[in-house]
């Protein structure tokens, strides 16, 4: 037992001595490994953290932007400068089979080397030495990417130093990026010639396909071209491309006959509709104005079938009215709830030499009567009641410069309710309303509604602003018009589905709802438009039209609770329209757009109910006298329903109509005195006014008046309605610049053309005479 213990002790002692002898060696190995590890870490740090500006710039470079519609269908690819196409796709968007083919063709061991392949380098070096020239390369995918990031100079000779530099850059890339990211960058940057870079753009430009639609033959073909785009071109050198493709195909058991190969890889040209360019250009400018880089992919809410319908409608109408010299059309449709643009047609024909490239959605036009709803909205905001009666009679406004508005049909309709004045688009009530509200107040309100084109135009703005004489864009007009179905909220226009923007309440909810009620009232429209079938939709809708600038601008606005539409027709090259054309043309297009969007939903009962415009909450519809706007008395022959603010109901109940009275047993109308001359010209019976007979005199115009042409109305329909009163007999004769304009009996009314310059008027009645002068500017 003791001997065994002694033997074990000796053995342990010997082992201890051996360990002591090995300790210096172990320490040396550890030190060497530490040094090697430190060197490797240092080298890695140098490669990883040393400045690599070319890579930094490369990662930030701009790519072609792909625009998709609301169904994720590609509608346009925006090229870079000088027409270069370079679409960018993430590795997840690139089919695995396509990745595999490129790895087989270029770098089988890509995922297993640090950026360079030692075996390939030795092989290439041996072959090059044997041939005494460079006949073989050893470039990995990472080295090729390094060459793309830092391109060789065009005349630089390829030497061992050139290759060494690319190898070092490849290592720098490998230390900074993952293998998947390197492959992704490589596949998106490969040169294919003809201003095409990246497999995504190559697939589209060679085969008019998305990457996931490529056949195996086409995938292999794309892997062949980048090595030498010209040499392996399937168009110029089909034999070369076929031979190389078969080399790659053999490695994946793919074989095909040459004639089948040529057929399966036939080039198909990609064509995008140029009419999309107006919208695309606007989007790019929006990003540019905000100093933002446009993303590689933009998902729009564009409804492509709707856009095609609009383009067809515009072209058809322009062909029908081609003899009127109307050459351009534009349309815009937005979704009220979101502010998304669902259709933008900037011009009916982008290739039209007559200003086809000009975008009618953002070019400025006179709006005509299409802006009148905003004037009446401001009136409601200021407390003017919906029951207010407007005098649609000859009037002039202003001081030194007298502004004389005319109705489009040169008729005057006497007292009219606010809803009729707006729905029938009467001019004189609108001008009187602006005169009372003030131009500054209205201009400020329009700017608040997003009419930024009006900035800086106040000095040259007069009362004709009520009739839309100032220039604005269709984009501003459609966006602003959407506040009415949107309960007074002005939505920011959304470019894509990701943007989130703030909205603004510009008018009260009830104001917006009342305007919708006015504009959807078909009976109220009848005075100005008759029974216009174009406005009679099967669903709740509102319309407002406008013509201006000698019919050079014809506009229609339309909306449902869900959508707002704007259509413009006219000439962008400044040519004058030679025939009278009505706003019913764009109104018909707008109606067809709303039908497309809304009629399919009418089959759903719950949806049909949701299409109705909401009613104001702080107002109650009450019976009023249709003529006076007051509470009807027992003599009022006609009553209508109109909104009265709840807080004013008691006051309204006490304001009974005083216009309709019984006189000598018969119903008589006691018009206010301002209607005296209008009533006298209507050949009406059963009325009374405070008529005062005086010596012959002009009631209109006044002596020394200055008239200004209204650009919103064609020159040939602008006339001055001359009115006189008094005299000893019921017959008078008018002389205009010394020329007789004929006799008038009972009613002393004449119409003379509005002609520039100084003019004189003289009236003779028995032995009385009166003369005045006026100026037309």
For every predicted segment, state its role:
Residues 174, 226-244, 294-306, 352-392, ...:
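Active-site loop and adjoining helix of the penicillin-binding protein/serine DD-peptidase-beta-lactamase fold
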Residues 2-70:
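N-terminal type II signal-anchor transmembrane helix
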Residues 300-323, 332-335, 344, 351-363, ...:
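A penicillin-recognizing enzyme superfamily signal
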Residues 130-154, 271-289, 337, 384-442, ...:
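Conserved catalytic neighborhood of penicillin-recognizing serine enzymes
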Residues 37-44, 133-308, 312, 444-447, ...:
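Non-catalytic, structured segments within soluble enzyme domains
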Residues 12, 25-26, 68, 250, ...:
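Soluble, non-transmembrane domains of envelope/secretory-pathway proteins that act on or interact
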Residues 111-121, 197-200, 259, 380-399, ...:
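Short, well-structured active-site flanking segments
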Residues 102-103, 252, 256, 310, ...:
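Active-site SXXK
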